[in-house]
């Protein structure tokens, strides 16, 4: 450790960690930023060569932020280890501000032998366009070095507790809403960084063969439009995709369907009273419970219209059909995806690398057959 660097501590107190690493998306009063770091060689199985903590205030000059303190320390440390390749991991209570994000991007461009993964507890000023652009420059691949940014989940919080907190042997106890807040922040970061889906994931999960089996995940792609002068205007800041959360004793014990994760996300957008149209493209139509909750949402939000295009119809031989009828009766438009919707999703939500959408055998026939089933419902 370098004793000349100020504001470095060996471990933080448990109450400090619990207070500052709270992952509630909107919080006030957390004006100190904590950054826990680990430096490793490219051998991920080895122990960290260096691990410690920086802290700094949000509002003084950027040089006082913990990200800048880390860069100052690391550049000095790096002079003694010039030829090695290193993997650096940060666990940060707030994501970097605009100036810090730009400085980190410059640092990575100057030292391509360093890779950086940033786990953040919360997103800082994520609604500001200049901040969004700075994070995209930092994280998006453009033929050169870039950072990987992720939202802290249970495993990362537990790791920080074990490695950076003076817990006196006590286990980490997550907050009740940690998994829900993680889902919201994960989706928001995906919107901000414009995450895209792997092509294989799309073709596997959105294949519309009626007899497909083994697809236990539901993917939901979405876009939002606002009415302006009798025209629907696409809101690029609210466009992305979600999938259902699998059962997890540290997350959602019973799992959480993609539709419910999406309903959790919408209030986070803070839409005003203008007219909005939300369009979902789902790999499966909603189950009964999700359909009921979506129907309740549009009944309580008359300024939001809902369109659902499903690749396949989910039917558990139970009340799914009743749920779809309720959703339709309460004003939602429900349809089966055809070629144009599949192509739109491919062009918009998939990392297609410039490749055009290639329909699979029977796409049109399956779409027509499923449309007939939906009309009968």
UniProtKB/Swiss-Prot annotation:
Which parts of this chain are annotated as the region Essential for cytoplasmic localization? 1-60
- For region Interaction with DNA, the annotated ranges are 213-215, 312-319
InterPro entries on file: APOBEC/CMP_deaminase_Zn-bd, APOBEC_Cyt_Deaminase, CMP_dCMP_dom, Cytidine_deaminase-like
**Ranges for domain CMP/dCMP-type deaminase:** 29-138, 214-327
Using the UniProt annotation, give all residue ranges assigned to the region (Necessary for homooligomerization).
209-335
Chain positions recorded as Zn(2+) 2 binding sites? 257, 287, 290
Q: What class of enzyme is it?
A: hydrolase
EC number(s) stated in the UniProt entry for this protein = 3.5.4.38
Q: Which reaction does it catalyse?
A: a 2'-deoxycytidine in single-stranded DNA + H2O + H(+) = a 2'-deoxyuridine in single-stranded DNA + NH4(+)
Binding positions (Zn(2+) 1): 65, 97, 100
Q: Where in the cell is it found?
A: Cytoplasm; Nucleus; Cytoplasm, P-body
| Main localization category | cytoplasm
Which molecular function GO terms apply here?
Answer: cytidine deaminase activity; RNA binding; zinc ion binding
- State the source organism's domain of life: Eukaryota
Residues carrying Phosphothreonine: 32, 218
The cofactor required is:
Zn(2+)
Annotated GO biological processes are: cytidine deamination; cytidine to uridine editing; defense response to virus; DNA cytosine deamination; innate immune response; negative regulation of single stranded viral RNA replication via double stranded DNA intermediate; negative regulation of viral genome replication; transposable element silencing
CDD domains membership: cytidine_deaminase
**UniProt keywords, alphabetically:** Antiviral defense, Cytoplasm, Hydrolase, Immunity, Innate immunity, Metal-binding, Nucleus, Phosphoprotein, Repeat, Zinc
One further remark on this entry is: Accumulation of APOBEC3G induced non-lethal hypermutation could contribute to the genetic variation of primate lentiviral populations.
Give the protein's biological function: DNA deaminase (cytidine deaminase) which acts as an inhibitor of retrovirus replication and retrotransposon mobility via deaminase-dependent and -independent mechanisms. Exhibits antiviral activity against vif-deficient: HIV-1 and simian immunodeficiency viruses (SIVs) and also simian foamy virus (SFV). After the penetration of retroviral nucleocapsids into target cells of infection and the initiation of reverse transcription, it can induce the conversion of cytosine to uracil in the minus-sense single-strand viral DNA, leading to G-to-A hypermutations in the subsequent plus-strand viral DNA.
Subunit (UniProt) = Homodimer. Homooligomer. Can bind RNA to form ribonucleoprotein complexes of high-molecular-mass (HMM) or low-molecular-mass (LMM). HMM is inactive and heterogeneous in protein composition because of binding nonselectively to cellular RNAs, which in turn are associated with variety of cellular proteins. The LMM form which is enzymatically active has few or no RNAs associated. Its ability to form homooligomer is distinct from its ability to assemble into HMM. Interacts with APOBEC3B, APOBEC3F, MOV10, AGO2, EIF4E, EIF4ENIF1, DCP2 and DDX6 in an RNA-dependent manner.
* UniProt free text on domains: The CMP/dCMP deaminase domain 1 mediates RNA binding, RNA-dependent oligomerization and virion incorporation whereas the CMP/dCMP deaminase domain 2 confers deoxycytidine deaminase activity and substrate sequence specificity.
Which named protein is this? DNA dC->dU-editing enzyme APOBEC-3G
The protein's gene is named: APOBEC3G
């Amino acid at each position: 450790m370098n004793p000349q660097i100020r504001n470095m501590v060996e471990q933080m107190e448990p109450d400090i960690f619990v207070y500052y690493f709270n992952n509630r998306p909107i919080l006030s009063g957390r004006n100190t930023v904590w950054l826990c770091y680990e430096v490793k060689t490219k051998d991920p199985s080895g122990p960290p060569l260096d691990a410690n903590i920086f802290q700094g205030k949000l509002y003084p000059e950027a040089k006082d932020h913990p990200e800048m303190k880390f860069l100052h320390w690391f550049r000095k440390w790096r002079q003694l280890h010039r030829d090695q390749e290193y993997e650096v991991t940060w666990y940060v209570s707030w994501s970097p501000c605009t100036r810090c994000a730009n400085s980190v991007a410059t640092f990575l461009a100057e030292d391509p032998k360093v890779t950086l993964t940033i786990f953040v507890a919360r997103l800082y000023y994520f609604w500001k366009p200049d901040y969004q652009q700075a994070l995209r420059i930092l994280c998006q691949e453009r033929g050169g070095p870039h950072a990987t940014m992720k939202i802290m989940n249970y495993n990362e919080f537990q790791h920080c507790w074990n490695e950076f907190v003076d817990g006196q042997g006590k286990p980490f106890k997550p907050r009740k809403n940690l998994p829900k807040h993680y889902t919201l922040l994960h989706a928001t970061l995906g919107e901000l960084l414009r995450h895209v889906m792997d092509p294989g994931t799309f073709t596997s999960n959105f294949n519309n063969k009626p007899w497909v089996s083994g697809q236990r995940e539901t993917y939901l792609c979405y876009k939002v439009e606002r009415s302006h002068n009798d025209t629907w205007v696409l809101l690029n800041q609210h466009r992305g995709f979600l999938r259902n959360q699998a059962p997890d004793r540290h997350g959602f014990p019973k799992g959480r369907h993609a539709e419910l994760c999406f309903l959790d996300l919408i209030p986070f957008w803070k839409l005003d009273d203008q007219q909005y149209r939300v369009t979902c493209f789902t790999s499966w139509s909603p189950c009964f419970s999700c359909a009921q909750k979506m129907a309740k949402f549009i009944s309580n939000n008359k300024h939001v219209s809902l369109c659902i295009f499903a690749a396949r119809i989910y039917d558990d031989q139970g009340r799914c059909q009743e749920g779809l009828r309720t959703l339709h009766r309460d004003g939602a438009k429900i349809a089966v995806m055809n070629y144009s919707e599949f192509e739109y999703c491919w062009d918009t939500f998939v990392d297609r690398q410039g490749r055009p959408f290639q329909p699979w055998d029977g796409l049109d026939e399956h779409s027509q057959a499923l449309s007939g089933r939906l009309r009968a419902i």
